[in-house]
């Protein structure tokens, strides 16, 4: 994250709005009927002239020194970027990092967080709605306060195809080939099984990911 130069002490709210813009609200798409349409505030974009030369790593306090056993690591990243295996008492791994990266990649492409905590049951509910039921072997090991049987029930009818639907609804400007590239990357990056999740090396060599990078990053 870029460092931000401080405002002058006598700066008014109007001065700050002029420099940063007013907070913009975005509608939260929902595949189910809700009592009230949801909204979220769009993340702040800091102008270049307010950035400092300092740069900060947002590691959520999870950075580890080389040689430190993974099993000694405490804590987890924020829930909406945390892999579901970590939320079921599985140890941290590089596969967990890849899940978090995929959340950021999806948010950049979709301009929307794929998994959030606004639904009943929290972030796991939205993960299940988008990706389908969790592995049954995880049942009983959820670290949160509330666990739901339908999260692990393979017969539960949920929005199994909503990952593709989310891509199509959030990026109607994209063509079918591009949407298929994005779906291919996200399906493998969001695999429930850490061993089957894309590694960083595999992602960089993936033809679908490279096609997207070539288009948007030159």
Model-derived regions: residue spans:
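Structural recognition of an alpha-helix C-terminal capping motif at a helix-to-coil junction
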Residues: 109-110
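Conserved catalytic-loop aspartate of Hanks-type protein kinases
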Residues: 97
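Regulatory extensions flanking the kinase catalytic core
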Residues: 188, 194-218
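C-terminal lobe substrate-recognition/regulatory segment of protein kinase catalytic domains
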Residues: 61-68, 131-185
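Activation segment/activation loop of eukaryotic-type protein kinase catalytic domains
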Residues: 1-77
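Conserved region at the C-terminal end of the protein kinase activation segment
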Residues: 62, 67, 86-92
């Amino acid at each position: 994250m870029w460092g931000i130069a401080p405002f002058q002490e006598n700066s008014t709210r109007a001065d700050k709005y002029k420099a940063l813009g007013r907070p913009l609200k975005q509608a939260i798409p929902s595949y189910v009927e809700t009592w009230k349409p949801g909204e979220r505030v769009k993340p702040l974009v800091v102008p270049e002239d307010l950035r400092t030369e300092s740069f900060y790593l947002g590691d959520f306090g999870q950075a580890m020194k080389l040689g430190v056993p993974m099993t000694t690591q405490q804590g987890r990243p924020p829930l909406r970027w945390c892999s579901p295996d970590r939320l079921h008492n599985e140890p941290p791994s590089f596969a967990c990092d890849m899940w978090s990266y995929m959340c950021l990649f999806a948010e950049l492409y979709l301009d929307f967080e794929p998994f959030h905590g606004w639904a009943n049951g929290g972030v796991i509910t939205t993960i299940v709605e988008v990706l389908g039921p969790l592995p049954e072997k995880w049942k009983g090991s959820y670290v949160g306060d509330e666990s739901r049987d339908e999260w692990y029930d393979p017969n539960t009818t949920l929005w199994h195809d909503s990952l593709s639907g989310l891509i199509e609804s959030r990026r109607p400007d994209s063509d079918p080939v591009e949407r298929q590239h994005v779906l291919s990357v996200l399906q493998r990056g969001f695999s429930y099984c850490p061993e089957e999740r894309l590694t960083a090396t595999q992602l960089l060599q993936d033809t679908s990911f490279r096609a997207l990078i070539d288009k948007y990053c030159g």
